[in-house]
C-alpha cells in the first residue's frame, strides 16, 4: 500500500485526505494543530511542531518511508515539500521550483525569460523607493503585492493622484504580509479575473477548467465567488489556457497540480501568478469535478505518487459556483434564512460564524 504524506490537515485539506483514503492509500498527515479537522481522518496523524521546519518534516518523511507528498491548497510549506521530493527522489516539484513558484519576483523573472504573458513588475527596496517608482515609471494605476504570500493578503491597488500617506499605508500592509519582507509594484490590469486549473504530468500541463472569479472592488480585491465553466467566449478561454500553459512551463512545474490566475485586458491574457498546487476556496477540490466531470483531487494525489492521472471525465458535467457571504463589519446578531440551504441546487454549505462573533472588514 502506497503512503501519501499530506502537509496540513485543515478544512481545505480534508477533501484530499478523504479521497486518498477512498483510493486505498495509507495517509499520513502533519499539522501543528492537533485538533485540525483532518487529523481524525488519517491513518496516522503527526504534530511536527513546525510544519515549515525542513529538517524536522524531512526526518518524518524518511522515517515513515513515504511514497509521495502533497501540500494541497496552501503554500506555507511548499519549500518543505520540494526538499522532501529532492531528498527522497519522489514525484513532484523540486525545492528550486518550489522557491520559484512561491516568490512572486522570481516568478515574474521566469515568465519574462520564457515569454509568458505578464504585466510590468518591479521589486521595491522600501516604501520611499516604491513611491518614486510609482510616480516615475508607471503612467497607469498599479498593484502593491507581497513578494511571498498566497491568496489576496496584502495586495492593494494604488491609483494615480492618491495621497502619498495613503500609498504608504497600503505599502506597509503589503510589507507586513510578505514572508520575505519584500514588496512588488506591478502594472494594474483593468479587466475580469480568472483562474485556470491544471494538472502537470511528465512536464505537460493539462487544463481541466477555466474559472470566472468574483471579487470585491479596489483596493483589496478579496475573492467572494467562483463560477465554472467559464461563460466567456471560446477565443478568450483559449488565450487564458495558452497563458496558463506557458506559465507552468516557464516555472518548470512537473507532476503537480497548478492554480493559474490571470486577467484579460483588451483581449489579451496576463498572468497574475501561479500556485504549484491545487487552488483554495474549494475550486480544485469541489468545483472542478462538478463542472468538468474530472476528479482533480484524485489526479493530484496520483501525480504526487508518480502514478499517471486519469484526466477523462468520470462524472456528469454541471454548471457550478461557490459564494462567500460576508456581512458588514461588526457584531453578528443573528443568522436567518438557512432553510434555503436545503434546496436541491445546493451541493454543500458551511457557516463559519455564530451570533456574537465579530465580523472583520473584508481586506484579505
Segments from the language model and where they lie:
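A conserved helix-loop-beta module that forms one wall/lid of the active-site cleft
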Residues: 86-154
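Active-site "cap" helix and flanking loop/linker of ATP-utilizing ligase/carboxylase catalytic domains
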Residues: 239-260, 265-266, 275-333
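ATP-binding N-terminal substructure of ATP-dependent carboxylate-amine bond-forming enzymes
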Residues: 1-97, 128, 309-310, 353-364
Amino acid at each position: 500500500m502506497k503512503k501519501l504524506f499530506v502537509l496540513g490537515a485543515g478544512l481545505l485539506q480534508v477533501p484530499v485526505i478523504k479521497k486518498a483514503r477512498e483510493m486505498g492509500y495509507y495517509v499520513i498527515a502533519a499539522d501543528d494543530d492537533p485538533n485540525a479537522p483532518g487529523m481524525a481522518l488519517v491513518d496516522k496523524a503527526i504534530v511536527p511542531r513546525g510544519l515549515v521546519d525542513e529538517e524536522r518534516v524531512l526526518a518524518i518523511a524518511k522515517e515513515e518511508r513515504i511514497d509521495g507528498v502533497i501540500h494541497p491548497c496552501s503554500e506555507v510549506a511548499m519549500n518543505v515539500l520540494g526538499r522532501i521530493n529532492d531528498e527522497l527522489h519522489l514525484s513532484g516539484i523540486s525545492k528550486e521550483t518550489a522557491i520559484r513558484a512561491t516568490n512572486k519576483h522570481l516568478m515574474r523573472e521566469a515568465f519574462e525569460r520564457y515569454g509568458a504573458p505578464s504585466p510590468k513588475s518591479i521589486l521595491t527596496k522600501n516604501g520611499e523607493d516604491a513611491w518614486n517608482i510609482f510616480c516615475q515609471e508607471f503612467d497607469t494605476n498599479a498593484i502593491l503585492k507581497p513578494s511571498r504570500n498566497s491568496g489576496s493578503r496584502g495586495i492593494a491597488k494604488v491609483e494615480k493622484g492618491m495621497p502619498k500617506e495613503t500609498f504608504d499605508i497600503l505599502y506597509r500592509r503589503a510589507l507586513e504580509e510578505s514572508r520575505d519582507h519584500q514588496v512588488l509594484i506591478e502594472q494594474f490590469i483593468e479587466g475580469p479575473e480568472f483562474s485556470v486549473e491544471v494538472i502537470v504530468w511528465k512536464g505537460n500541463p493539462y487544463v481541466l477548467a477555466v474559472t470566472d472569479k468574483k471579487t470585491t472592488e479596489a483596493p483589496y480585491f478579496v475573492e467572494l465567488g467562483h463560477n465554472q465553466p467559464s461563460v466567456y467566449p471560446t477565443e478568450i478561454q483559449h488565450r487564458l489556457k495558452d497563458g496558463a500553459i506557458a506559465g507552468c512551463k516557464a516555472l518548470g512545474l512537473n507532476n503537480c497540480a497548478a492554480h493559474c490566475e490571470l486577467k484579460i485586458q483588451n483581449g489579451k491574457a496576463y498572468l497574475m501568478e501561479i500556485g504549484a498546487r491545487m487552488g483554495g476556496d474549494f475550486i480544485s477540490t469541489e468545483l472542478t469535478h462538478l463542472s468538468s466531470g474530472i476528479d482533480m483531487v484524485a489526479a493530484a494525489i496520483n501525480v504526487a505518487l508518480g502514478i499517471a492521472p486519469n484526466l477523462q471525465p468520470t462524472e456528469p458535467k454541471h454548471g457550478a459556483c461557490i459564494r462567500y457571504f460576508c456581512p458588514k463589519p461588526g457584531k453578528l446578531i443573528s443568522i436567518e434564512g438557512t432553510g434555503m440551504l436545503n434546496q436541491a441546487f445546493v451541493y454543500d454549505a458551511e457557516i463559519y460564524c455564530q451570533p456574537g462573533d465579530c465580523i472583520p472588514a473584508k481586506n484579505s
